[in-house]
């Protein structure tokens, strides 16, 4: 089993593609990818490092598979778990709700002990509001807009994965 579990929910395939991009950069020996629709509580509990991919739909709603999984998520003890979040949203058509689902999932896992890493700068995005903010200048995780800024996705993912790997001291973990 890989040391990192990447779990995603996706209707259009965008968040799944991001999850696979992240896995490719980290390496299949380091990270495995799971569709949350086919995952269990035990699947998440098996990993001490989690990368959770959640898109935002319409007016700030979580993707339906994640929404269905939230009650299970609420049963997990996240103490000792390191978690990085990533998600897709549309900063133009849904500017008041851009990547809100990042905040929704954070609000579930953080009170249950999760240590969240991978905050991402808001610079370069054009939105009105987001529940996915860690502070005025950062999202709680990587925000991707495949609708309005697909040309920035590869660079954003690459930089974020490097940042998260450093925050997790991944080289030390892999060599232990």
Swiss-Prot record:
InterPro entries named in the record: Flavodoxin, Flavodoxin/NO_synth, Flavodoxin_CS, Flavodoxin_lc, Flavoprotein-like_sf
Cofactor(s) the protein needs: FMN
Entry-linked PROSITE patterns: FLAVODOXIN (PS00201), FLAVODOXIN_LIKE (PS50902)
Record's note on what induces expression: By low iron conditions and by heat shock. Iron regulation is mediated through the fur protein.
Is the keyword Flavoprotein assigned to this protein?
yes
Keywords per UniProt: Electron transport, Flavoprotein, FMN, Transport
Disulfide linkage: none
Write one Pfam family the protein is assigned to.
Flavodoxin_1
Q: Where is the Flavodoxin-like domain?
A: 4-165
Output one GO MF annotation.
FMN binding
Concerning its family, UniProt says: Belongs to the flavodoxin family.
Job of this protein: Low-potential electron donor to a number of redox enzymes.
PANTHER family referenced in this protein's UniProt entry, alphabetically: FLAVODOXIN 1, FLAVODOXIN 2
Q: What is this protein called?
A: Flavodoxin
Organism source for this protein?
Klebsiella pneumoniae
The gene for this chain is fldA
């Amino acid at each position: 089993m890989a040391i990192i579990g990447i779990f995603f929910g996706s209707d259009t395939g965008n968040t799944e593609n991001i999850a696979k991009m992240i896995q490719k950069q980290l390496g299949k020996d380091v990270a495995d990818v799971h569709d949350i629709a086919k995952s269990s509580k035990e699947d998440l509990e098996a990993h001490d490092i989690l990368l959770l991919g959640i898109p935002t739909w319409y007016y700030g709603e979580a993707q339906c598979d994640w929404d269905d999984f939230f009650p299970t998520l609420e049963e997990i003890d996240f103490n000792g778990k390191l978690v990085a979040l990533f998600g897709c949203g549309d900063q133009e058509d849904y500017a008041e709700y851009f990547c809100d689902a990042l905040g929704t999932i954070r609000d579930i896992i953080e009170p249950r002990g999760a240590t969240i890493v991978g905050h991402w700068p808001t610079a370069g995005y054009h939105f009105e509001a987001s529940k996915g903010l860690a502070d005025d200048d950062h999202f709680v995780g990587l925000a991707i807009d495949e609708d309005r800024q697909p040309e920035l996705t590869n660079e954003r993912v690459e930089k974020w994965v490097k940042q998260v790997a450093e925050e997790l001291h991944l080289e030390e973990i892999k060599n232990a």
